[in-house]
């Protein structure tokens, strides 16, 4: 029996090679083909607003006053080199070699008054000349910029809350300062451990630094807390520090008390003893109890206040099979303990600490801004690049604050 095959029913094999109308790449990585880009950036895509922001706050004057220039003398000047890196980060490119995509852009070239931007290697060599001194000066520049923006926005916070947290940046290769430490995503890999502090009210970066990939010691935490006072705006009179258990030590508590800060720090390693008869339940429908006590851990000079929250564990329904009963009452609960010098009910203090959870979102935004990118093998270059990235992050925050202020003012005028 002969079967006739329908015309066009045979499967055709896909040809090898490149297609003329291949879809554009959605991500830029090491294998992406690149050349000089012929497309232009939209003036309404954020870059024009950034240029106007520089003019509004007088960024050039602040830069020349606060920035400590390195020994390398670029042809365009230190301000143009730093502004170019900030613009690259603001656009969304977070690697120095991404300058090849915007080298001929009319808006960037017009801002710097050149026919084309320098090669990407020029910016990399300039970054290679930066070090710890330049990072400190960039942080000072950020402090002056904060004062200027707060003045423009009419912000006068007498009390602020500062959230302190660390993150992990996994590195690949022989990077200076990389260590094996707490890294949940890439266990056993080398990494760096940046330390960051954010202001809760404005969600901006206040102070931080790039660190080796090891746990924060008590002396380092104390030095970091003592340095916060040097970066506070002039209107601030009271500060509440909130940190996780990595920062709990007598050195850090002593530094916070010496600076006059209120603090709520999660417990790590301390075993305070609470009065069994002092547990109270502020909400009847929630199986949550609170307590507080004064306790002096070993090695501490005096006692501090500890507040606790215990949550009843889920009990399995009784079965016909014999089961092991719980020997101690503490095994029936999950405990959350904090060290603080704040007065008030224990549940109010823990509710205040729980508002710190938003710092994880801020750290994630900073990492997407470019904090995850390590441009050099040298630690001093990466240390300076860390502060530049966080300065770009703050500029993005300030532009949103100014835009919100202008929108609110326009709504008030229309309502009146």
Question: What is each PLM-predicted segment?
Answer:
Residues 53, 99, 168, 346-379, ...:
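Short amphipathic alpha-helical "interface-anchor" segments enriched in bulky aromatics
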Residues 2-6, 10-32, 262-370, 374:
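An anionic, glycine-rich sequence signature occurring as long contiguous blocks
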Residues 165, 238-248:
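Acidic/histidine-rich, metal-coordinating catalytic segments
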Residues 2-189, 194-214, 221-234, 259, ...:
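Dynamic "connector" segments at or just before major functional cores
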Residues 41, 71-80, 185, 328, ...:
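Structural motif
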Residues 253-262:
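Short, surface-exposed basic-aromatic patches at helix termini and helix-loop junctions that form
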Residues 395-416:
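A short, flexible helix-boundary coil/loop motif
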Residues 161, 240, 262:
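Hydrophobic "anchor" residues on beta-strands that sit immediately upstream
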């Amino acid at each position: 029996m002969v079967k006739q095959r329908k015309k066009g029913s045979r499967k055709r094999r896909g040809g090898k090679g490149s297609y003329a109308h291949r879809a554009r790449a959605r991500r830029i990585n090491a294998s992406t083909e690149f050349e000089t880009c012929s497309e232009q950036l939209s003036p309404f895509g954020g870059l024009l607003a950034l240029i106007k922001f520089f003019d509004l706050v007088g960024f050039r004057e602040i830069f020349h006053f606060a920035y400590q220039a390195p020994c390398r003398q670029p042809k365009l000047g230190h301000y143009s080199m730093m502004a170019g890196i900030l613009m690259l980060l603001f656009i969304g490119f977070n690697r120095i070699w991404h300058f090849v995509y915007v080298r001929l852009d009319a808006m960037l070239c017009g801002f710097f008054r050149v026919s084309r931007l320098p090669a990407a290697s020029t910016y990399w060599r300039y970054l290679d000349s930066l070090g710890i001194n330049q990072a400190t000066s960039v942080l000072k520049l950020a402090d002056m910029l904060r004062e200027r923006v707060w003045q423009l926005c009419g912000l006068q916070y007498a009390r602020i809350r500062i959230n302190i947290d660390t993150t992990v940046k996994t590195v690949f290769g022989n990077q200076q300062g990389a260590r094996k430490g707490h890294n949940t995503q890439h266990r056993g890999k080398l990494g760096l451990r940046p330390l960051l502090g954010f202001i809760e009210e404005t969600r901006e970066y206040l102070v931080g630094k790039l660190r080796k990939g090891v746990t924060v010691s008590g002396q380092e935490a104390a030095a970091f807390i003592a340095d916060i006072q040097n970066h506070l705006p002039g209107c601030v009179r009271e500060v509440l520090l909130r940190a996780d258990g990595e920062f709990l030590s007598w050195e850090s508590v002593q530094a916070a008390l010496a600076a006059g800060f209120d603090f709520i720090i999660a417990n790590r390693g301390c075993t305070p003893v609470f009065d069994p008869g002092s547990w109270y339940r502020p909400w009847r429908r929630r199986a949550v109890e609170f307590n507080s006590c004064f306790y002096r851990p070993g090695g501490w000079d005096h006692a501090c206040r500890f507040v606790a929250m215990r949550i009843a564990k889920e009990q399995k329904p009784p079965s016909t099979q014999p089961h092991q009963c719980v020997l101690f009452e503490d095994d029936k609960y999950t405990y959350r303990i904090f060290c603080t010098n704040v007065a008030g009910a224990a549940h109010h203090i823990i509710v205040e600490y729980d508002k710190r959870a938003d710092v994880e979102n801020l750290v994630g935004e900073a990492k997407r801004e470019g904090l995850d990118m390590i441009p050099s093998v040298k630690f001093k270059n990466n240390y300076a690049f860390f502060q530049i990235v966080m300065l770009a992050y703050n500029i993005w925050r300030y532009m949103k604050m100014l835009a919100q202020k202008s929108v609110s003012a326009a709504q008030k005028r229309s309502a009146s």
